[in-house]
Swiss-Prot record:
Family according to the record: Belongs to the archaeal RpoK/eukaryotic RPB6 RNA polymerase subunit family.
Species for this entry: African swine fever virus (isolate Tick/Malawi/Lil 20-1/1983)
One cellular-component annotation, GO: virion component
InterPro entries in UniProt: DNA-dir_RNA_polK_14-18kDa_CS, Pol_omega/Rpo6/RPB6, RPB6/omega-like_sf, Rpo6/Rpb6
Name listed for the protein in its UniProt record: DNA-directed RNA polymerase RPB6 homolog
Amino acid sequence: MADNDNEDVIMDDLVEEYVETEEENFVDSEEESEDKSEDKDEIVESPSICEGFVQASSQTLVIIPDNERITSNVLTTFEATRLVAVRAQQLAINGSTMLKKKYSSPIDIAKQELFNRKIPLLVMRCIKVTPEGQKIVEIWNPREMGIPLLD
């Protein structure tokens, strides 16, 4: 995991979905708003920043070791699309490409980086949030995962 410290991380809550209702969005002037950022997907720059982010939201990040992972080693279509979107956004603001061949658009470059297994991003899958406030996650490198076909 030490060689991936400079790579971006995408958090994806696969197990627990968060559904907001109008009542949950309403905040009375006397009440304080609860921090709901723990249940939403977040994009952060590196795992170390991610740890700071999760600790700032009163949670501790627990990373499952690679040999004890419980989720599938195949990217979901959502994860693959999100990886391409995040990478295309980076490339659109003058990010450097990992490919030698020239492509016309950031989306094409991001797709080729994903399919060539050169995309410099990580996928963080939230497994569970314990009552004690610990967030149990798996960090996957897309280079070691199966990739679905994208149009």
